[in-house]
Amino acid sequence: YPSVAPLGDGGFVVIWRDDYGSQHGGSGWDIFGQRYDSSGKVSGDEFRVNTETSGNQSEPAVAVLSGGGFVVTWRDDHGTQHGGNGYDVRGQRYDASGVAAGAEFLVSQVQKSGNQYEPSVASLKAGGFVVAWRDDSGGSHDSGSGYDVWARVFNADGTQAVAEFRVNKDQKSGNQYQPTVASLSNGGFVVAWRNDQGSHNDGTGAGSGYDVWGRVFNADGTQAVAEFRVNQVHFSGSQYEPSVSGLKNGGFVVAWRDDQGSSHNDGSGNGSSYDVWGRMYGANGAAAGDEFRANTYISTYQYGPSVGSLDDGGFVISWHGYGQGDSSSIYAQRYDVQGNKAMVQLVGTGLADEVT
């Protein structure tokens, strides 16, 4: 999937995977980007992010930095040729004008056995950034799981601020993956991930087949809130594909896919085969209300959620779904600062839609 982030000048940058890189002077697959101004017009030329052009580059993620620049991370499938593993996570910083700042760098620098991928990146209040990723050789790395989630914190200049560390401290059996990271207004960050060993108990009972877990960190990488299960009510079926975003009030919101929606009722009736659910948290990491279903249409499949915070303190959740009278569309639901639905769902089409 492509990744998009807003820029400080009101524009935005889009990053994507190009499967035809060999025709563009690059790899089999490359990572490309394009900046746009505040009116949506192209700003500058399309550019290739990856310097290393052997093998395939995929799974891009982008975050805007406080100085006006941005950082891109991605999966490199030819890591053994680039100083790393079979698969590695690499990164590249850019300044506010879109010019590469320094050389491409290896994010997963210590964990070099097995594969490292599924990167997620977020900018931090102090000017640096944090990257989280999936490590497929967790059993060899700090006595972790089959798969683990790791993270590393960088300063604004790309130097290391906090050495890479395992995010899932307690949940070490089974596999932990699909990480998503977001910055918090106090300078810290939160990581959420998929745990496929739902028998893990957080003190309120065992979970699902797959569960969504989270953990909150201070800016220096120390623990602020111990890991916790996000889906506290829905234990049957599987909960995964998490997305997290920090909120203006210092808290955060997590959205995820629920594969047992037909058995999960939010008071308005049972849901779809797959549903999108969410839950808000306060700055102290405590849940701010119950988990809620984002999709109003409760037939067929709703999945692939993405959540983003808004300047008014609210947030918006978007997802891929099958609605009433259409085959496949992108839906969105906006929420106010209290978590109440603030407007009707938006349905995108294959045309040049505009919202006014």
Predicted region positions:
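Extracellular, repeat-based ectodomains that mediate carbohydrate processing or recognition
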Residues: 1-343
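Acidic, glycine-rich low-complexity segments
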Residues: 340-356
